[in-house]
Every structure is written in structure tokens, then in C-alpha cells.
């Protein structure tokens, strides 16, 4: 009887939800490919840097974070303290969420003084890093959800159980949770993944400009804060302080804000080396207009 109650699932997945899942998965797979092709066409690219970026994500985003998490929990008394004090648990989750981004910044800081590094090197590294994250993590989860949803609509719980290789008497209540999520949220999750990737790529260009122009290191602090802000909603959701449905919209808004700030900064100080990638006619127009006004002033004096 308990098994039957555990497998009770009400309704089916709406077609709109299925479509949004598929579109989201396609977006997450296509994004790094499109960005990679665009960068290859605009800059001298090296496939080796793509591979380095991919390995960096595996080492930092997956292996190191998991090892760090296990190491923290193995410290005597830590698990008990985290169970007793929510603040400590929240702090640990926040740190684990932010560690990959700070590690990524550290890699760039380590290589920033190498003169051989050009914008293509930075971009290809980030494309490799982003591709692994989006394709192997985000897109895999989204397409897996889509397969489960299509299988359930076609063959019911028995089909899902057969696909997963488990008993049909198990607990499939998670299907109710998946159906309760509006289809647009799945689509927004894919869009948010692409926005986050754009933010990171913007950081790469930003980092290149900071290094090339020898600007103040306070920009690194701004970057670290923005990275942290992007990861805060997920960390709050992990510890139960933010509803799951609110995470993607909030992260998307934060990413849009970060992108807006990056674009403003880039438009103010685009160096000649970045011109082929981010050339804007209006910027050239303003430069010519400014040069004309300066020549007039010099002639007047």
C-alpha cells in the first residue's frame, strides 16, 4: 500500500512544458558552439586553450568543490555544528557555490603578466570552461528531464521505471514536483545559463582590458563581488531560504545587471586590440567627433 501511495502521480506534462525543456536544452548546447565559431572567425584562436578551459572546469567546478565539501564535513564536529546552526550551514554553502568563480579569477590573475596572452587566448579558455559546464552539466540535466517527461506522458510510471532501471513500486513523487513547475521556468533556466556564460565572457574581455591598460586592481574586487552575487540565489535555495521558482528569475536579473555594467565599461574604454570583436560604429563616430572638436579648439587657441 505504501508503494502504491508513493507512486501516485496526478496528471501529465503539458506540451508547453515539454517544448520549453527541449528549447532550453538546445540553447545550452548551441550557445558555446555559436560563441566559439564567432570567436574563431574574429580572433586568432587556439584549440589548446579550449581544452585547457574545459579541464579547468572539471578540476575547479567539479573535482575541487566536491573534495573541498567532503574535507569540510570530515572535520570533527563540523556536521553537528552545521545541523545546530543554520548560519554556519548557509555560510558553508555560499562558500562552496562561490569557490569555482573565485578559482577562475585566480587562474586569470596568475597568467595576467604573461605577455604572450592575447584576447583570443582568454576567450578560447573561457569558451572551453563554459562549454563543459553548459553541455555536460546544465544541458544534460535539462535533456534528462525532457526524456523523463516524454517517457512518462507516453508510457506512464512503468516507462520511467524501466528507463531508470528501478522498480515501478518506488517513489516517483518527484514527477509531481516537476509538473508543478511552469514551463516558462524551464526555458528561463536555459536562458539564465546562457546569460551567465555571457557574463563570464564579458569578465574575460574586461580582465584583458584591465591587464592591457594597467588599470586599478579595484576592478578585480568589483568582478569578485559580481561573481558572488550571481551565485547567492542558488546558495540561498540550497539552504531553503529562497524558493526554487524564484532562483532563475533572480539570477537572470542579476546577470542582466552585470552585463549592462560590463557593456557600459567596455564602451568607455575599448582598446584597439578588442576592436575586431566589439567594434561599434557609434563609438568610432564619437571618436571622430571628439577629434574634430579637439582640432577646432587647438585652431581657435
Segments from the language model and where they lie:
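Hydrophobic alpha-helical segments at protein termini of multi-pass membrane proteins
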Residues: 2-301
Amino acid at each position: 500500500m505504501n508503494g502504491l501511495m508513493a507512486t501516485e502521480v496526478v496528471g501529465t506534462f503539458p506540451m508547453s512544458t515539454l517544448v520549453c525543456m527541449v528549447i532550453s536544452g538546445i540553447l545550452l548546447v548551441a550557445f558555446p558552439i555559436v560563441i566559439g565559431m564567432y570567436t574563431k572567425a574574429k580572433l586568432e584562436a587556439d584549440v589548446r586553450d579550449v581544452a585547457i578551459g574545459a579541464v579547468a572546469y572539471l578540476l575547479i567546478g567539479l573535482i575541487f568543490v566536491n573534495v573541498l565539501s567532503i574535507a569540510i564535513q570530515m572535520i570533527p564536529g563540523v556536521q553537528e555544528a552545521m545541523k545546530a546552526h543554520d548560519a554556519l550551514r548557509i555560510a558553508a554553502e555560499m562558500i562552496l557555490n562561490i569557490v569555482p568563480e573565485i578559482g577562475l579569477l585566480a587562474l586569470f590573475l596568475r597568467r595576467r603578466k604573461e605577455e604572450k596572452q592575447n584576447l583570443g587566448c582568454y576567450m578560447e579558455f573561457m569558451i572551453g570552461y563554459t562549454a563543459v559546464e553548459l553541455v555536460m552539466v546544465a544541458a544534460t540535466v535539462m535533456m534528462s528531464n525532457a526524456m523523463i517527461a516524454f517517457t512518462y506522458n507516453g508510457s506512464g510510471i512503468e516507462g520511467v521505471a524501466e528507463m531508470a532501471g528501478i522498480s515501478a513500486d518506488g517513489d516517483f513523487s518527484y514527477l509531481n514536483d516537476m509538473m508543478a513547475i511552469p514551463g516558462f521556468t524551464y526555458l528561463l533556466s536555459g536562458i539564465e545559463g546562457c546569460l551567465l556564460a555571457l557574463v563570464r565572457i564579458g569578465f574575460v574581455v574586461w580582465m584583458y582590458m584591465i591587464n592591457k591598460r594597467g588599470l586599478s586592481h579595484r576592478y578585480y574586487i568589483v568582478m569578485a563581488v559580481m561573481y558572488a552575487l550571481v551565485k547567492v540565489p542558488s546558495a540561498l535555495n540550497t539552504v531553503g531560504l529562497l524558493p526554487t521558482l524564484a532562483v532563475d528569475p533572480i539570477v537572470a536579473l542579476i546577470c542582466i545587471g552585470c552585463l549592462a555594467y560590463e557593456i557600459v565599461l567596455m564602451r568607455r574604454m575599448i582598446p584597439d586590440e578588442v576592436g575586431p570583436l566589439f567594434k561599434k560604429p557609434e563609438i568610432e563616430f564619437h571618436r571622430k567627433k571628439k577629434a574634430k572638436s579637439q582640432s577646432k579648439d587647438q585652431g581657435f587657441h
